[in-house]
């Protein structure tokens, strides 16, 4: 299972692009990459455009990241979600907690 994380820091925003699969094997590495960024107190924008699969362990990572950015005064926006990922956040109720309104794939 492959996972790639690319990070770009600006003054108040950290932009992250995630590519690959987020599952039980890759979620710990993703958490290890994102948690220090979340604790900087900046706004965190995470593009999931190139994420081909995510399971519940991936959701758990984003819940933890959401809590960390809120503790430090930042915000979390997930961008470019596929229809499959939007549905995953919808059926779990997390779309009402985590902002997934960033640019959606397909212009939604």
Curated annotation (Swiss-Prot):
Annotated ranges, domain STAS: 3-108
This protein's UniProt keywords: Phosphoprotein
Membrane spanning residue stretches: none
Recorded GO MF terms: anti-sigma factor antagonist activity
Phosphoserine: residues carrying this PTM: 52, 56
CDD domains for the chain: STAS_anti-anti-sigma_factors
Pfam families registered for this protein in UniProt: STAS
Function: Positive regulator of sigma-B activity. Non-phosphorylated RsbV binds to RsbW, preventing its association with sigma-B. When phosphorylated, releases RsbW, which is then free to complex with and inactivate sigma-B.
Family: Belongs to the anti-sigma-factor antagonist family.
NCBIfam families membership: ant_ant_sig (TIGR00377)
Name the UniProt record assigns to this protein: Anti-sigma-B factor antagonist
Name of the coding gene: rsbV
